[in-house]
Amino acid sequence: EDLPVALENTLVVAQKCNQWTGFSLEKALFLDPATIGSYGEERFLQDGDLLWNSTGLGTLGRMAIYDSSKNEYGLAVADSHVTVIRAIPSMVSSEYLFKYFSSHTVQSVIEDKSEGSTKQKELATSTVKSYMVPLPPYEEQLRIVAVANNVIASIMRR
């Protein structure tokens, strides 16, 4: 049976799409339509999802925010090496979570919190779920993001 065109053009977001220099769908591959059933609902990406590389030294911990407007194909799924963190938009800012999880505070200990052999460390979903995040009121999250963005912009101008 033919799948809707949207499913035939579903992109698979892998760790190689998620670099510290930025996020790009150019490296994404198309989903094999026969495997669509193997992806849980949580792996179908939504605007604002955090994508956290969760496997391997050198890639473990890299993070991006998914922007659905940059996906000309519509649908995308995260492969098993990318952990999807979906904020509740009315309560938690994706930008705030991105700034927190990308911070030195988290990144400096991420390998210690991962499991597995030396080269193939894995950041378990249970570890991500149990991570304690300081969560100020929503408006304060937005202020923190604005201040961080201003500081980063100031540094980049130098």
Task: Outline where the language-model segments fall.
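Sequence-specific dsDNA recognition surfaces
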Residues: 1-3, 16-52, 67
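A short glycine-rich beta-alpha junction/loop motif
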Residues: 74-83, 92, 110-111, 115-136
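Short, charged beta-turn/beta-strand-edge "cap" motif at the junction between a beta-strand
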Residues: 56-60
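Glycine- and charge-enriched low-complexity intrinsically disordered segments
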Residues: 88-90, 94-106
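Extended boundary segments
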Residues: 1-15, 121
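Amphipathic alpha-helical coiled-coil/heptad-repeat segments
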Residues: 108, 130-158
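Short, compositionally biased
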Residues: 63-79
